[in-house]
């Protein structure tokens, strides 16, 4: 059976989170889930789409014997702060604060902390290795290129798709990336 508790982790802002576990009888390793870009909630739902992506990942990790924390990014859902003005550095700090909070719990093995980041969360997980002692990181759907290159490539793909539309013709793309 999976137990879940809603918690608030406070520092300069309050982060609404859910901690999931089988029991608190012994120290267990921790997985911190960090979601991708946007205002998706801690369960993985956004804009009317209920996917429960992060809830399902959490359940999987708990079944494997981990304690799992997933949280709402700053300025979204049950977290305070300003989503629009929060920087990447702020997001890394928020994740680090959650790790520090979790390491103080008597049922967390502070030597066995793993971060699982999806999309933008993969970037945050990677940056966390600079300041946090982690047992490992799991990167899901992380970028394989810089943000500028990714945006240029997305523009290129949109241009290609529009070119294939019947009855429409664009003379040239807004930006043609070097490939």
Kindly give the residue locations of the regions a language model identified.
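N-terminal cap/lid segment of alpha/beta-hydrolase-fold proteins
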Residues: 1-26
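Alpha/beta-hydrolase fold nucleophile elbow
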Residues: 107-119
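Conserved alpha/beta-hydrolase
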Residues: 52-78
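Short glycine-enriched nucleophile-adjacent loop
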Residues: 122-132
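Alpha/beta-hydrolase
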Residues: 34, 71-73, 140
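Alpha/beta-hydrolase active-site loop
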Residues: 85-105
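Accessory cap/linker subdomain of secreted extracellular hydrolases
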Residues: 140-179
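Short, surface-exposed "cap/lid" segments of acyl-processing enzymes
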Residues: 24-60
